């Protein structure tokens, strides 16, 4: 039955090793992707209201693809940049 199982998607596509080139660590990558996934989710939520406050997906999306998978593909293609913020010490 070769060819009947769809190729795995999600964290295996794109590979984690490729994604780690865009961030300093696995933890930074998780935060980076989660923030972008929240923006994509908010974009879809506001479409019904006619507001366009957030930027939608920057890559072609598949049917019922999760925002986190979309965010990871955007990161892998180099469509997003990370800017370090300075932490303020009290």
UniProtKB/Swiss-Prot annotation:
GO terms for cellular component: DNA-directed RNA polymerase complex. It catalyses: RNA(n) + a ribonucleoside 5'-triphosphate = RNA(n+1) + diphosphate. GO terms for molecular function: DNA binding; DNA-directed RNA polymerase activity. Pfam families: RNA_pol_Rpb6 (PF01192). Keywords: DNA-directed RNA polymerase, Nucleotidyltransferase, Transcription, Transferase. It is an enzyme of class 2 (transferase). The RNAP catalytic core consists of 2 alpha, 1 beta, 1 beta' and 1 omega subunit. When a sigma factor is associated with the core the holoenzyme is formed, which can initiate transcription. Promotes RNA polymerase assembly. Latches the N- and C-terminal regions of the beta' subunit thereby facilitating its interaction with the beta and alpha subunits. PANTHER family: DNA-DIRECTED RNA POLYMERASE SUBUNIT OMEGA. This is DNA-directed RNA polymerase subunit omega. The lineage of its organism: Bacteria, Bacillati, Actinomycetota, Actinomycetes, Micrococcales. The gene is rpoZ.
């Amino acid at each position: 039955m070769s060819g009947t199982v769809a190729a795995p998607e999600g964290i295996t596509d794109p590979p984690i090793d490729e994604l780690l080139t865009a961030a300093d660590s696995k933890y930074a990558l998780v935060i980076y992707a989660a923030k972008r996934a929240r923006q994509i989710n908010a974009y879809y939520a506001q479409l019904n209201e006619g507001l366009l406050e957030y930027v939608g997906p920057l890559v072609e999306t598949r049917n019922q693809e999760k925002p986190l998978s979309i965010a990871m593909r955007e990161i892998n293609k180099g469509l997003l940049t990370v800017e370090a913020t300075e932490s303020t010490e009290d």
